[in-house]
């Protein structure tokens, strides 16, 4: 579980907690998971289930139901602690933990990731595992070649990776190291997406560093088709034309902190038919975005 990344510019201010709150629904049930922590440890943590607080942690003290206990590891989440001791998969604790632990995080710029489906597997092995599905997806892309990724053992019992390129009736086999960076990035992100369960969450930092603008549009369509929620950052204004106004947030960085403004709050009457990209580039939203 990666609730957030520490803002390293504020490491000296160790006593000021950073907080995250996640609202989500599973079937007809609503959950709110909250976490506040400093670099020294978790300060407070809670889980609300259908408006009732069923778990609350303050420092090392954890209250759950009618019992209280202590958690000695300062950075160990109470939700994980309780889920590890429960065998009832339908309990609110296990349902919440399963949902949150299946959130996949990808930094497309550095190719770093945190995804449950990739535990104990290399990214190459997961790409091979999802290769047939990736090829099926690429058939729907007009701007990307069709290929598969396969693995084989050489005479020294070392795993080698290859790329099968399809062009009409022709098949070409090349070492995967020959693949363009765009192909590698596309395969990597698609394999993570295809590994997520339905209603999963995918968080991508700087999506345009891994995907061509046209491929991003195809990727968003696939996310919608698979019923996955995607949270991503981007500097590419072209993407604004594909998103609903209430799903767009603008980030403004100042003095080491970022603030966020929802587009539909800035401009309540805006609709998808408006040219949001043009409005943004013409500085229509600047005053509201940069305001305190």
Question: Which role does the model predict for each range below?
Answer:
Residues 158-194, 201, 207-213:
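Conserved ABC ATPase signature
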Residues 22-28, 49, 165-170, 253:
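Short acidic, glycine-rich loop/turn motifs
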Residues 30-32, 171-174, 258:
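Short, mixed charged/polar active-site loops
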Residues 143, 217-292:
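C-terminal lobe/lid and adjacent interdomain/linker elements of RecA-like ASCE P-loop ATPase modules
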Residues 1-7, 186-192, 233:
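Phosphate-binding glycine-rich loops of NTP-binding sites
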Residues 1-36:
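Conserved P-loop NTP-binding catalytic core
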Residues 21, 29-151:
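Electropositive, glycine-dotted interaction segments
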Residues 36-42, 59-62, 176-182, 264-268:
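A short, sequence-level motif marking secondary-structure junctions
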């Amino acid at each position: 579980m990666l609730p957030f990344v520490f803002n390293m510019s504020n490491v000296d201010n160790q006593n000021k907690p950073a907080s995250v709150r996640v609202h989500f629904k599973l079937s007809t049930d609503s959950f709110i998971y909250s976490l506040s922590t400093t670099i020294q440890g978790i300060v407070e943590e809670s889980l609300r289930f259908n408006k009732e607080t069923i778990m609350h942690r303050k420092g090392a003290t954890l209250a759950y139901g009618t019992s209280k206990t202590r958690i000695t590891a300062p950075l160990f989440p109470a939700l994980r602690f309780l889920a590890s001791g429960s065998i009832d998969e339908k309990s609110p604790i296990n349902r919440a933990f399963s949902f949150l632990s299946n959130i996949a995080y990808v930094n497309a710029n550095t190719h770093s990731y945190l995804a449950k489906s990739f535990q104990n597997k290399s990214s190459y092995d997961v790409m091979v595992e999802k290769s047939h599905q990736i090829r099926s997806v690429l058939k729907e892309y007009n701007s990307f070649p069709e290929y598969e990724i396969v693995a084989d053992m050489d005479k020294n019992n070392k795993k080698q990776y290859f790329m099968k390129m399809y062009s009409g009736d022709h098949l070409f086999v090349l070492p995967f190291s020959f693949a363009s960076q765009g192909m590698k990035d596309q395969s990597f992100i698609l394999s993570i997406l295809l590994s997520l369960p339905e209603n999963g969450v995918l968080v991508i930092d700087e999506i345009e560093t891994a995907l061509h603008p046209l491929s991003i549009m195809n990727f968003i369509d696939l996310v919608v088709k698979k019923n996955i929620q995607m949270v991503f950052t981007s500097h590419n204004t072209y993407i604004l034309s594909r998103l609903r106004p209430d799903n767009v947030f603008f980030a403004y960085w100042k003095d080491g902190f970022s603030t966020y403004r929802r587009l539909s709050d800035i401009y309540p009457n805006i609709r998808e038919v408006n040219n949001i990209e043009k409005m943004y580039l013409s500085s229509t939203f600047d005053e509201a975005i940069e305001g305190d």
